[in-house]
Amino acid sequence: MEIKLIVLSLALLLDRFIGDPPLLWQRISHPVVLLGKAISWGEKNFNDSSLPPSTLRRNGMWLTVGLVAACIFAGLVIRSILPHAGTAGAIVEVVIVAILLAQKSLADHVQAVAQALRDDGIEGGRKAVSMIVGRNPDRLDEGGVSRAAIESLAENASDGIVAPAFWFLVGGLPGLFAYKLINTADSMIGHLNDRYRDFGRFAAKLDDVANYIPARLTGLLAALATSLGHGREAGRQALSIMCRDARLHRSPNAGWPEAAFAGALGLALAGPRQYGAETVEGPMLNATGKREAEARDIDAALVLFWSTMSLMTGLVIAASLVGLFVG
């Protein structure tokens, strides 16, 4: 375990300060893009609307299981090869883990929304936020754009960083690869619309299971980071709102980090949202909080995000040092 903690510590630092170099991924496909292509291929070949719902559910289940198994196998193969490469193998493992984390890329995309609102007004904000959320941005005002960016930041703090880190510690590279496949499948086919309701059902449920612990850990880390940065009362407020409102969210997991961010920032988040022609109803988290969010609230959310990531990284580094000296 101490080796995985050291690898994760270095990967978190590498991802934080370097992130995903655009020039690299312009030349080769990012691993998540490759996962997406595999899922897209399976969806095109096995999600036939003429089939009965039970068959679609079965097809979606076997596609997801098959791809997860392939990811686990790939992780096992790479894990068996790397030790024979010595120091180079250790460096490669750190780089692989860093590539599958998303601290800097997530923060950069969210910061772009705040900057677009300042520079180009509502139209710029809508365009920027459309890069990170699936909802229809055309009907969003400045408050809606800002809330959408903050909600995406909170949810993806779990999905994009805490959960991959958690599953790497649990299962090494096979666990990390499997999680990234599950999460990518959920984002692509785990929707409650006519096209994916049956075919993507298994992927969505599996993602709920995979993110159950990480989502709650993310909320707790955000509340603790708030306490460390703004005092115990602010931290208690974030924790209280999270425990009270997290289950109001339509997702069994996203509500935990989103409610923690809502309580920490004094904002009302979530609520009704538009996905294409579909309106998804839902209550607000921290309903008495500020609803007319703006660019400076995105800035505050980014400060909270980085505080949360710093806390997690510090805990991982501390655990790795304890493992080295005690073990």
From Swiss-Prot:
The membrane topology of this protein is:
Multi-pass membrane protein
Q: Provide the protein's localization.
A: Cell membrane
Q: Which GO terms describe its molecular function?
A: ABC-type vitamin B12 transporter activity; threonine-phosphate decarboxylase activity
Q: Which GO terms describe its biological process?
A: cobalamin biosynthetic process
Record-level GO cellular component terms: plasma membrane
Q: Looking at the keywords, is Transmembrane present?
A: yes
Q: Does the keyword Membrane apply?
A: yes
Write the record's keywords in alphabetical order, separated by commas.
Cell membrane, Cobalamin biosynthesis, Membrane, Transmembrane, Transmembrane helix
Q: Which family does it belong to?
A: Belongs to the CobD/CbiB family.
Listed HAMAP family: CobD_CbiB
Record's function text: Converts cobyric acid to cobinamide by the addition of aminopropanol on the F carboxylic group.
- Its name, as the record gives it, is Cobalamin biosynthesis protein CobD
Query: Which organism is this protein's natural source?
Result: Brucella suis biovar 1 (strain 1330)
